Amino acid sequence: NGAHLRIARLAIDTGYEAPAVYAWSRKVGCAQVAPVKGLEGFNRSSPVSGPTFVDATEGGKRLRRGARLWTVAVSTFKAETYRFLRLERPTAEERDEGAAFPPGTIHLPTWVESEWLKQVVAEQLLTVRTKRGFAKLEWQKLRERNEALDCRVYARAAAWIAGADRWPEEKWRDLEDQL
């Protein structure tokens, strides 16, 4: 409807330039920004864990416990994303009769570009054999560019960190009323 929404929490990947990310997140503040590190695998007790305090450097000087780092089980959120993309959506006729979208539906704008859609489905989950012969699940790229999928995964992690998974119905109604 054109309403402007504020960012509740922003997750930023530390994988490429961790010192710069730590410095920027300290400057902006930990209430708004969550430096994250993605880990593969489904054997995590929680999709997001932390924060843990890590050492950071600023201007060549070591800052002990200078940054808060969140760990994200990216496989969990990728699987959730693909599951939500497969949800059956109600038709326009069904919506006119009061049918709602299922929880988790990913709503895409009509103006979304095909390149973005290709990126959001740029990986597939395969069963591969380890060197010792055991089967394990692994995400493999179908195409080189997958930034849209990564952004969705880290946005979902930011929602988790902000506590959206534990918000009561009343909180969601309050947010909806602000639109």
Please give the residue ranges for each predicted region.
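Mg2+-dependent endonuclease catalytic cores in nucleic-acid-processing enzymes, primarily RNase H-like
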Residues: 1-132
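Long, compositionally biased intrinsically disordered regions
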Residues: 103-179
